[in-house]
């Protein structure tokens, strides 16, 4: 069988045994500006990867490329056919009910049953017929997540999906994402500006700078995670350094969490207890 042309569009799903995401010397430019500059990346089956970087570093362009919403100018890119993306804005059709938004674009006979199952997984079985205008921000984002899950993706792309949510809702969404990831085992790429969020959720954190991977750190911390864990502050300190943030104080191997972290840890315990 002929080798597919990989220069401008993602190829079909890789063969068994290969990483579901493979990028080799990928370039994407707008005019003379290279937003992605010779990028190489593998994401293993079922791996949860977080992507950090300053604004303009190429994070969203990379995610859009993996989602099939943008092309590459050169290089090779392989992604699964079964993939889904969730963005910061839920992007729900306001004239369609929750369940119809979940199966939007799918041609299946048991659409409502599939939508109901997906909404049940995200805790919204009771909002099956609700319209987007009646949903809270967290509920709307869960509908968007259900829309991704109903497609049974091998790759789930998350572009800052929690950025507009309040602190407690974000924590609950973090736990929901982890629970669903464990159940469905897709590879996940999360784009975020939040260093703590990246450490809390990911197996591996990658820092993007000027369209290239500056470094990657494996997060070898047990779950459930919070910022008070031994080792959390060490990983945070290193990531902040890679992002160009000066860390003034030396970080001890078992640091005392600052006041904000204590508050967030308490919120996580409260959210997990409910």
UniProtKB/Swiss-Prot annotation:
Organism superkingdom: Bacteria
Enumerate the GO terms in the molecular function aspect: ATP binding; ATP hydrolysis activity
Q: Can you state which reaction this protein catalyses?
A: ATP + H2O + aliphatic sulfonate-[sulfonate-binding protein]Side 1 = ADP + phosphate + aliphatic sulfonateSide 2 + [sulfonate-binding protein]Side 1
Arranged from A to Z, the UniProt key words for this protein are: ATP-binding, Cell inner membrane, Cell membrane, Membrane, Nucleotide-binding, Translocase, Transport
Q: PROSITE patterns annotated for this entry?
A: ABC_TRANSPORTER_1 (PS00211), ABC_TRANSPORTER_2 (PS50893), SSUB (PS51291)
**Is Aminoacyl-tRNA synthetase included in the keywords of this UniProt record?**
no
The EC number of this protein is 7.6.2.14
For the ligand (ATP), the binding residues are 53-60
Mind telling me which SMART domains this protein's record contains?
AAA
Is the Lipid biosynthesis keyword given for this protein?
no
The record's subcellular locations are: Cell inner membrane
What is annotated about its quaternary structure and interactions? The complex is composed of two ATP-binding proteins (SsuB), two transmembrane proteins (SsuC) and a solute-binding protein (SsuA).
Function as written in the Swiss-Prot or TrEMBL entry: Part of the ABC transporter complex SsuABC involved in aliphatic sulfonates import. Responsible for energy coupling to the transport system.
Q: What is this protein called?
A: Aliphatic sulfonates import ATP-binding protein SsuB 2
Q: Which species expresses this protein natively? A: Pseudomonas syringae pv. syringae (strain B728a)
Task: Point out the gene that encodes the protein.
Answer: ssuB2
